[in-house]
Amino acid sequence: MDPISREFFGYYAMKRGFHPNSIGAFTKTSAMAFMNFPLMNYIQTISPRPILFIIGEHAHSRYFSEDAYKMAAEPKELFEVASAGHVDLYDRTDLIPFDKLESFFTENL
């Protein structure tokens, strides 16, 4: 199993992230929403509202957030969580940067 599939399997197919209503895989139409809505075409319209991008140091998806950060207008911030993978930031309370989230929302809400 490739590393990305292993990470998601270790979360969604095991007790940690399992849900009884899950079919355990993507459907043929799972990606249709992404294909029909080009997310990055509108990222600059978020400004002047601030954006906080949180990425795991070892997340396979970090490139997506880094690209989104580059495309976003100010104000923006990119925050990296050391030692975190993609799914670690779902439920690993020892890695989720609660202090950063609190300071961001306190300052910007």
Regions found by a protein language model. Give the residues of each.
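Conserved beta-strand scaffold positions in the cores of enzyme catalytic domains, especially
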Residues: 78-80
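Catalytic active-site module of serine/aspartate enzymes centered on a nucleophile-bearing elbow/loop
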Residues: 82-109
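Acidic beta-to-alpha connecting loop that harbors the catalytic carboxylate
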Residues: 56-59, 83-85
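Conserved loop-alpha-helix segment in the C-terminal half of the alpha/beta-hydrolase fold
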Residues: 57-76
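Alpha/beta-hydrolase
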Residues: 1-44, 60
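Short, conserved loop/helix-junction motifs that constitute active-site signature segments
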Residues: 44-47, 71-73
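Short beta-strand/loop motif that positions the catalytic acidic residue
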Residues: 46-47, 52-55
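Hydrophobic, well-ordered secondary-structure elements that form the walls
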Residues: 46, 76, 101
